[in-house]
Amino acid sequence: RLGKTAVSSVGGIPVPPVVRYIAGYQAGAKAAFPTVKTLNGYSQDFVAQDKCKNVALSQLAQGSAVVFQVAGGCGLGALDAAKEKGAWGIGVDADQYYVNDRVLTSAQKKVDVAVFTAILNQVKRNVFAGGSNLVFNAANGGVGLGKINAAVPADEVAKAKAVAWQVHLGKVDVPTTCANKGC
């Protein structure tokens, strides 16, 4: 309900991890509201908050109701822009709910889960897979949602959690690239 007309994303640089976040966000928005317009832009920076703020302000001027920042520290500028214009923001990596009262939630990398798993594998299981990577995703608890803003209606929270659970179970295929070169 919060972004039925248009939603947007501000990426730092279009590298694969950033594109995957944006692809999932756009697919989720389209699944919830098939006619929603999705906007995307890049700041070409992960640090300078003014660059992300400018990208977000442009998107907000085009009608975006929700801005998802996928630009590290630069993205804090996008969250500021959302608040400034009375729109909503979504944080990334860590729980950015604390940034301002217009942050809906955050797409979190659960680094604690990765660290705990690596330690558990070594200490309890005596397994050290040197030279290989552990991959964390929704299915193994490696990513998830941060705190959800109280402004989000309870029925919408329930729907979001139900979809997140379906992703966790592997029943929802989350795209890793955007349709029509949208990101």
Q: What are the language-model segments listed below?
A:
Residues 1-183:
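A residue-level marker of the well-folded mature domains of exported/periplasmic proteins
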